């Protein structure tokens, strides 16, 4: 193999490694966001239960400091 062929192969290898590393980072960020949404969505307090009970609904969590009251929660 000539020096040029080795350089081209090395460059291709580096590009493929960099691309796969970026894809992995995006997947990690997506998983982290999904976990954060899950944690926020299950935040419930006694005040939320009481508030929703007055409306004959179920407390499904708190968003922006306000209770989320619906007929039934979807998990």
Curated annotation (Swiss-Prot):
Which terms in the GO cellular component ontology are assigned? extracellular region
From which domain of life does this come? Eukaryota
Q: Which ranges are cleaved off as propeptide?
A: 21-44
Span of the secretion signal? 1-20
Task: Give the GO molecular function terms.
Answer: ion channel inhibitor activity; toxin activity
Q: Is Signal set as a keyword in this record?
A: yes
- Keywords for this protein: Disulfide bond, Knottin, Neurotoxin, Secreted, Signal, Toxin
Q: Where in the cell is it found?
A: Secreted
The cysteines covalently paired via disulfide bonds are 48-60, 52-69, 59-73
**InterPro entries noted in UniProt:** Conotoxin
Annotated Pfam families = Conotoxin
Tissue expression remark? Expressed by the venom duct.
Q: What's noted about domains in the record? A: The presence of a 'disulfide through disulfide knot' structurally defines this protein as a knottin. The cysteine framework is VI/VII (C-C-CC-C-C).
- Family to which the UniProt record says this protein belongs: Belongs to the conotoxin O3 superfamily.
- For this entry, the protein name equals Conotoxin VnMSGL-0111
Organism field: Conus ventricosus
